[in-house]
Every structure is written in structure tokens, then in C-alpha cells.
UniProtKB/Swiss-Prot annotation:
Organism: Rotavirus A (strain RVA/Cow/United States/NCDV-Lincoln/1969/G6P6[1]) (RV-A)
Residue ranges that the Swiss-Prot or TrEMBL entry lists as coiled coil: 166-237
Protein name listed in UniProt: Non-structural protein 3
Annotated region (RNA-binding), positions in chain: 1-149
Function: Plays an important role in stimulating the translation of viral mRNAs. These mRNAs are capped but not polyadenylated, instead terminating in a conserved sequence 'GACC' at the 3' that is recognized by NSP3, which competes with host PABPC1 for EIF4G1 binding. The interaction between NSP3 and host EIF4G1 stabilizes the EIF4E-EIF4G1 interaction, thereby facilitating the initiation of capped mRNA translation.
Chain residue ranges for the region called Dimerization: 150-206
HAMAP family the UniProt entry points to: ROTA_A_NSP3, ROTA_NSP3
Similarity-based family: Belongs to the rotavirus NSP3 family.
Length: 313
């Protein structure tokens, strides 16, 4: 960039510096508020908004255009400067500026910023005093001009009204507030007491329920132990019964085939599960009764063939 474009360079630098200041202000505000943020995200969002506002409002092009006009004037080209001067002095330009000002005033009114607020903001500035809660109110040049033109008046009615406000009976106001506070305190205490009683009742019911559950669990454990003992006793009794029958079977004068068949049926009895063992005993007894019935029928038939009669005594 040549030396005679220094004004454009300075304007561009001011715009870039304004953007950096906006980023620093945003991040500093977030840090003071204790809000965690991503610097890259804040930078991107501020840049997007800043570029949009500067471009949409025409401020950037206006500044760079004026800077280019100054550079052309420094280079000895006064044509653009003369056109800008004539444009600024033209009645149509003045009318457009008045129209823009009126639009801005109506826009401020629509946002709730009325004439009183606009005038007060234009007449006064507030200067903060470092290290103090108070501040200094400074009058602007507009306020000084209004005083010189006699456009500033003192409203005596406001002073009298202010004096009446200062004579408020603060003692009675304090007593009223104290009564309201005591009433509110009493209601809060009543609610708190009610909540405490409900909480105690809930705790008592919970402890009572826990005791009932504990007793039931103890009874269930006792019943379980009793059932386990009964099951063990039945298993031992069944095992002893099977052994006793096997020993008794061996002392009989039955054929070996019959003994083997009965022993197999005895060995098939489920000694571990008493329910299955009872079913096995039932099957064994049915088989024995069936064999006895068949033997009796054979004996009965043999007696008839031999012309013998039989009787039960």
C-alpha cells in the first residue's frame, strides 16, 4: 500500500481494532459473570455479528469511502472531495438526513425510549468515582446551551412533593413491616412444625414396616431351616429304608432273577428328592402287588386243576 493511502489503512486498522475490542469485551464480560465459554466460538459469533452490522449499516463502506477521498485529496485529486462537499451542502441531502433522523427518533420511541429519556441522555453524562458508590453528573454542551437560552426551569411543585415524601412516618411503616414479617414468620414456623411432624410419622411408619419385614424374614428363615431339616430327615429315612429292604431281600429264598429285578427297582429310587422317591416307592409297590396278584391267580388255577378247594381264614 502506497504512502498516500495511509488514511484508508488507518480506517481499516480502526475497524479491525474495534472488532478485537468487541471480542475482548465479550470474553471479559463472560469471565466476570463466571460463565464458561469457548474462545473460538465467541470469536466466530462476534465476528459474524460485527461484519453483518458494519456491512448492513453501511458504516464500514462510509468510513473507507471517506478515507479514500482524503487520500485522493492528499494526492492532489480534489474532484471527489468537491463532489462530497457539494453533496453535503445539497438540499436533497439535508432532507434525507432529516428523514433519517426522524426515522431514528420514531424507532427509539417504538423501543420505549421516549423524548424525555432522549433529552436527558443528551443533556447529562454520569461519571463514576473509582472506589466509591457515588457518581458525578456532568452537564453536556447541550445542557449549557439550554441554560444560556433560558430553557431550564425549576419545578417548585416537584420540590414540595419531594418534601412531602420526606415527611413519611417511617416508624409506622417499620411497625407495619415488622408485623407482616412476624405474621409470615409464624406461618413459616407452623408449616415447618407440620412438616417435621409428618416427617416423624413417616419415619415411625418406615421403622415399623422395617421391623415387620425383619420379623417376617426371620420367620421365613426359620421355616426354610425347618424344611431343610425335614428334607434331610426324609432323605436319610428313604436311604435307610432302601438299605433295609435290600438286606431283607438278600435273606429271602427267591430266585436270583427276581432278586436282581427288585434290586434294580430299589436302586432306581431317587434318594435325593423325596417327592420323586415317593413316586418310585409307589411304582415299586404296584409292581409287587401286581406280581402277587399274578402268583395268586396261577395258584388258584393250579388248585382247580387238582380238584382242590381253598378258603381264607
Amino acid at each position: 500500500m502506497s504512502k498516500m493511502e495511509s488514511t484508508q489503512q488507518m480506517a481499516s486498522s480502526i475497524i479491525n481494532t474495534s472488532f478485537e475490542a468487541a471480542v475482548v469485551a465479550a470474553t471479559s464480560t463472560l469471565e466476570l459473570m463466571g460463565i464458561q465459554y469457548d474462545y473460538n466460538e465467541v470469536y466466530t459469533r462476534v465476528k459474524s455479528k460485527f461484519d453483518y452490522v458494519m456491512d448492513d449499516s453501511g458504516v464500514k463502506n462510509n468510513l473507507l469511502g471517506k478515507a479514500a477521498t482524503y487520500d485522493q485529496a492528499l494526492n492532489g485529486k480534489f474532484g471527489s472531495a468537491a463532489r462530497n462537499r457539494n453533496w453535503m451542502a445539497d438540499t436533497r441531502t439535508t432532507a434525507r438526513l432529516d428523514e433519517d433522523v426522524n426515522k431514528l427518533r420514531m424507532m427509539l420511541s417504538s423501543k420505549g425510549i421516549d423524548q424525555k429519556m432522549r433529552v436527558l441522555n443528551a443533556c447529562f453524562n454520569v461519571k463514576r468515582v473509582p472506589g466509591k458508590s457515588s457518581s458525578i453528573i456532568k452537564c453536556t454542551r447541550l445542557m449549557r446551551d439550554k441554560i444560556e437560552r433560558g430553557e431550564v426551569e425549576v419545578d417548585d411543585s416537584f420540590v414540595e412533593e419531594k418534601m412531602e415524601v420526606d415527611t413519611i412516618d417511617w416508624k409506622s411503616r417499620y411497625e407495619q413491616l415488622e408485623k407482616r414479617f412476624e405474621s409470615l414468620k409464624q406461618r413459616v414456623n407452623e408449616k415447618y412444625t407440620s412438616w417435621v411432624q409428618k416427617a416423624k410419622k413417616v419415619n415411625e411408619n418406615m421403622y415399623s414396616l422395617q421391623n415387620v419385614i425383619s420379623q417376617q424374614q426371620s420367620q421365613i428363615a426359620d421355616l426354610q431351616n425347618y424344611c431343610n431339616k425335614l428334607e434331610v430327615d426324609l432323605q436319610n429315612k428313604i436311604s435307610s429304608l432302601v438299605s433295609s429292604v435290600e438286606w431283607y431281600l438278600k435273606s429271602m429264598e427267591l430266585p436270583d432273577e427276581i432278586k436282581t429285578d427288585i434290586e434294580q427297582q430299589l436302586n432306581s429310587i431317587d434318594v435325593i428328592n423325596p417327592i420323586n422317591a415317593i413316586d418310585d416307592f409307589e411304582s415299586l409297590i404296584r409292581n409287587i402287588i401286581l406280581d402277587y396278584d399274578r402268583i395268586f391267580l396261577m395258584f388258584k388255577g393250579l388248585m382247580r386243576q387238582c380238584n382242590y378247594e381253598y378258603t381264607y381264614e
